[in-house]
UniProtKB/Swiss-Prot annotation:
A biological process term (GO) from this entry: regulation of smooth muscle contraction
Positions of disulphide bridges: 72-151
GO CC, one annotated term: plasma membrane
The protein, known as: Alpha-2B adrenergic receptor
Amino acid sequence: AIAAVITFLILFTIFGNALVILAVLTSRSLRAPQNLFLVSLAAADILVATLIIPFSLANELLGYWYFWRTWCEVYLALDVLFCTSSIVHLCAISLDRYWAVSRALEYNSKRTPRRIKFIILIVWLIAAVISLPPLIYKGDQGPQPLARPQCKLNQEAWYILASSIGSFFAPCLIMILVYLRIYLIAKRSHCRGPRAKGGPGERESKQPHPVPGEVSDSAKLPTLASQLATPGEANGCSQPRPGEKGDGETPEAPGTPALPPSWPAIPKSGQGQKEGVCGSSPEEEAEEEEEEGCEPQALPASPASACSPPLQQPQGSRVLATLRGQVLLGRGTGTAGAQWWRRRTQLSREKRFTFVLAVVIGVFVLCWFPFFFSYSLGAICPQHCKVPHGLF
């Protein structure tokens, strides 16, 4: 029964991890640089399932090491190498998640395939450093029976503690602290919302709004925004509107449509407003009014033939005192809003992926903790804390 279960787990491990590698290498949506961690992790798990578990199963079923003595030493080194690499890969993935959540825009620009491959190389080097000592220093293995030879891990206390700390306890502690930090960042980000991030809603709420019926200081000056008020008054040319009389008479009839409240009020004649030269551009009028002052001109008989087309309000922008200020405000707000939404989407994606990895790592820690705890306990107090062989 045990052999059947272990055999099924071996096949399931090989098939499942092969699908992971195939999906990352063939799917366009999964070709992100950080998914190289998953490819390397899946490769380590496949090596464990093909080179380690079958020989461990045979050793447990037979009760002794049936294969060559040299292969026993290589087998033990590969066992430590692949298992340590698998654990350290999960630690590297957790650090990658933390940097992606805490510094999303900055880290994503630096998360290149070359950098990820370099981190993967460091992971394998760490695993190799931990697994090589048993090959170099074999220690006191004791007498080996000729009929039933054994293949056991290094029983030196210093190596047991060092390998347990480097292979499991240190990466496990790092992963727990990192995912706790990610949880706190995600929770704080969720509680703040767009206003705490300086989102577009907050910036728009701080913009001044003109009071209906009151002429603002900016409207009293011959600025460019005043030329946006009505199409006919652009470029210094006025056109009569329905229900509106000439100068000196009642300005508007009761049925005349009013200007939108967000548009600056237009000063009437006699309030210090000067009309620019008809047919000139808004920039030229502004420069002439600032330097020389624009003298009043008589209106032409045919406004339609003399006046240039009226300026249109940019879509999605706010009207302020000047046209230049209006354009800059609209573009700045849109850019800030796009950055905020891009960061929000990135954080949401990272948080979902982080949750899945947290579940995987939690199950992984629960599976590995009993072995490393009992393995380390045998080195700390070998006489009084001896773990039964069957439980180990």
